């Protein structure tokens, strides 16, 4: 990972998102704080990001395993903020909330983004929160469905996120890994955002 950030810095890439699905503290054990040895590994990656100018961003995925719900929301928000604080204290200055490949209500995603965005802003030196929605590429639009009575569509995300202009929504293009082409941007703008 450190060598990837160095490589990214050489090519003027500005961010490395740490979001391995097999990393328990990102995913299956997202409610648990990092132990000291794992936290030191994160600190080293943060430093490598600072040195290479390819900023280290840490992601949490609280929607896949033992997912956050409306009934657990208040307690789980405190858990996530405590974890963000732990990571902030070792130098992390950008955070990502992941909801990809998982179910859940768009309104709950937006609520959590709103509260985490407020936390980020309260710190004064944290970059904008990034959010990976369930529909993160054109291929995912075709997989989208209804979850807990809400449509999992790009339009529904835009509706819920209009009041969160600083939260950066992730979109990978036509598929999960896809070349950046102007036609992809035009298609997204014209097909999913009503030209916005």
Protein language model features and the residues they cover:
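Aromatic-enriched hydrophobic runs in primary sequence
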Residues: 1-5, 11-19, 54-55, 97, ...
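Structural recognition of alpha->loop->beta junctions
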Residues: 11-14, 78-99, 150-169
């Amino acid at each position: 990972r450190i060598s990837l950030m160095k490589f990214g810095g050489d090519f003027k890439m500005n961010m490395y998102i740490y979001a391995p699905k097999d990393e328990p503290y990102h995913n299956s054990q997202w409610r648990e704080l990092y132990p000291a040895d794992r936290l030191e590994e994160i600190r080293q990656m943060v430093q490598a990001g600072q040195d290479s100018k390819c900023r280290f961003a840490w992601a949490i995925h609280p929607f896949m395993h033992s997912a956050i719900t409306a009934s657990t929301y208040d307690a789980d928000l405190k858990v996530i903020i405590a974890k963000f604080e732990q990571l902030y204290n070792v130098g992390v200055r950008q955070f990502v909330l992941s909801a990809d490949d998982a179910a859940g209500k768009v309104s709950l995603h937006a609520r959590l983004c709103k509260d985490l965005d407020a936390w980020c802003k309260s710190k004064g030196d944290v970059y904008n929160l990034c959010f990976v929605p369930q529909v993160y590429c054109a291929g995912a639009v075709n997989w989208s469905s209804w979850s807990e009575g809400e449509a999992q569509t790009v339009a529904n995300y835009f509706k819920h996120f209009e009041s969160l202009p600083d939260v950066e929504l992730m979109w990978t293009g036509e598929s999960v890994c896809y070349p950046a082409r102007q036609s992809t941007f035009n298609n997204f703008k014209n097909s999913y955002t009503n030209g916005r």
